Amino acid sequence: MMGRPEGLKLIDENGRRIDGRRKYELRKIHMEVGVLKNADGSAYIEWGKNKILAAVYGPREIHPKHLQRPDTAVLRVRYNMAPFSVEERKKPGPDRRSVEISKVIRGALEPALILEMFPRTVVDVFIEVLQADAGTRVAGITAASLALADAGVPMRDLVAACAAGKIDGEIVLDLNKDEDNYGEADVPVAIMPLKNDITLLQMDGYLTKEEFIEAVKLAIKGAKAVYQKQREALKEKYLKIAQEVAGDE
């Protein structure tokens, strides 16, 4: 949260936000599955102005071998922002924020994966932010979950994520960059809808207890809408495969 430029209104007198959305409206979301031929699973997501690519490799042999776990696979997640992903060029390579978000995303995904089926192996997840516009962690979780499903890693459910927040004293869904910079709070949430489980819940900023509950409920509602888009993207991929197989016969 940053100091706001004088006179900047995040919600106008008609209840419209700075990008024209209403309070409970998601940004435009586009998802594609199976976009990288050399990965075991992959997904690409455009969420507002965010552009994020996720790739999964494994389960595969883990090196060095002392990292092996005899009863389960190891999940490794690397979240990275490309140097050109933000307006001010970022130094290449992982920074403290990227390392922290990698751990957060791993924690959000791990409950959904049946890793005990593949002991002594590793599942590697790479998330590359090509363009950033607030909400990269929830978009990254959403893309990574799709890529894991595409790779055929056994899952209890997809993980879908969304954030709610507070701007100009109002609880709203899916903050954009200006709202994230100049708003009062941000609450990212990840869920497994079929299990009715929350796998990520964070808060940045200040909310009353009532506002926090409202924000969490709104973020869950948004995540359920994202979940439907994930399912549609997976169906679209396998429909294409079925059509290609039918065409070859």
UniProtKB/Swiss-Prot annotation:
Keywords: Cytoplasm, Exonuclease, Exosome, Hydrolase, Nuclease. It comes from the Archaea. One of its GO terms (cellular component) is cytoplasmic exosome (RNase complex). The keyword Nuclease applies. The keyword Nuclease applies. It is found in: Cytoplasm. InterPro entries: ExoRNase_PH_dom1, ExoRNase_PH_dom2, ExoRNase_PH_dom2_sf, PNPase/RNase_PH_dom_sf, Ribosomal_Su5_D2-typ_SF, RNase_PH, Rrp41. CDD domains: RNase_PH_archRRP41. GO terms for biological process: gene expression; rRNA catabolic process. Its EC number is 3.1.13.-. Its main location: cytoplasm. One of its GO terms (molecular function) is 3'-5'-RNA exonuclease activity. It is an enzyme of class 3 (hydrolase). Component of the archaeal exosome complex. Forms a hexameric ring-like arrangement composed of 3 Rrp41-Rrp42 heterodimers. The hexameric ring associates with a trimer of Rrp4 and/or Csl4 subunits. NCBIfam families: ECX1. Belongs to the RNase PH family. Rrp41 subfamily. Catalytic component of the exosome, which is a complex involved in RNA degradation. Has 3'->5' exoribonuclease activity. Can also synthesize heteromeric RNA-tails. This is Exosome complex component Rrp41. It comes from Thermococcus gammatolerans (strain DSM 15229 / JCM 11827 / EJ3).
